[in-house]
Amino acid sequence: MHKSVAPAPSILLLGFMASLPGFGVDMALPALADTAASLGASAHGASLAISSYMASFGIAPLVYGPISDRYGRKPIILIGCVVFILASIGCALAPSLPILLGCRVIAGLGAAAMALAMAMARDVYDDSVFRQKLSTIVVAIYVSPIAAPIAGAAVLALAGWRTIYVGLATLGMLLLVGVWLGLHEGSKSRQPGRLRILAMIKDYGRVLSHPACRSYLLASATSFGAVGAYATGSALFFIKAAGMSPNQFSLIFGLTSLASAAGAVLDSRLAAQGIASLYTVAGGLAIVVLGSTILTAMTLAGWTPIAVTVSLFVAMTFSVGGAGPGIMQGSMQQLPELSGTISAAGNCLAMVMGSLSSGLAAIFFDGRTLLSTTVAMLLCSTLALLSFLAAARGTTKPCSVPS
């Protein structure tokens, strides 16, 4: 049932909101070399424009989540939009690398408020309706890695790297207007005193000490870890070992991103038909475990034909995309009054696990095979499946299980 009636455009705005942080990363990627040359910096120095943004984006939601549980989501999101706009303009005008990096850190702080999109949807929708709407948001998140680099490359070719940040500021302005006019506050769980540091710590303690919620968050983080290992490890394998060009690999990465989006769309359709997320999540994660096991065995046998390997990656990313909305729904339905805190914790844990798994896949890459990638994916997906099953057994609000 609906908790409240939200205007139809709201969920589209939430999808736009959730995808904006990804645009902040992926639109800037094609311009790193030009940025370095323009500012007299090294390639490594220019790449810090990405990592500095991601670091602040990963940490800031830990503060925004509890604040939004106290004051509501919309004010935090509006402030985040303004910060993102101003910082992006600062990036466009930056005369040196240190100023660019400082503005990117601030832009990440603003973009971090967009992580509240999930919590805002949870405030408005409940049960299978929430899962359907959440799938729409997830589709937007998965599509952004395809659209953003293309847009960034086009802008770079037409007007230079600084215009990319003008474009990001423009996206921020569009979102600001959309949120101001089109989104309505749905949080009803505001509590005085929530801003105190000890109260915030207590909220996170409640979330992490709740067995089912903790297991859902671990399942979410480790499933994202499998994706992180794939993203880094597959690039190393296909480009360095298989000899593909970056453009050829981008086609494979785009295909798997579309597969993830298609999985989320299918989950939305299944939710509309009353199919419980218990089945879609468990089935999806089991496919990832099976696929990574097969790829590991193929790698050890020295047989990894490109067509078969890509097909398995497509199947696994499709399955992760289909499982994601159900995992997020499960985590937030345990403590709905702390949806912002749960969303923030999930975002931070996912960033940490994604960075860890992708780092390990890169560190242990042997220059020839997919072994480090497939093992990392197997470990992450197995832990995700076990965590989800533990959460499903221990949940106190099993609304995702059919009656």
Regions found by a protein language model. Give the residues of each.
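A late C-terminal transmembrane helix in Major Facilitator Superfamily
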Residues: M328-D366, M377
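Conserved MFS/SLC helix-loop-helix module at the cytosolic interface between two early adjacent transmembrane helices
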Residues: G58-L97
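Helix-breaking motifs and short loop linkers at transmembrane-helix boundaries and internal kinks
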Residues: S38-G40, G72, L93-I99, G243, ...
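Juxtamembrane intracellular "pre-TM" segments in multi-pass secondary transporters
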Residues: M1-S4, H184-L217
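Paired small-residue
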Residues: V83, A87-G90, P98-I106, A307-F313
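Cytoplasmic helix-loop-helix junction between adjacent transmembrane helices
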Residues: C103-I141
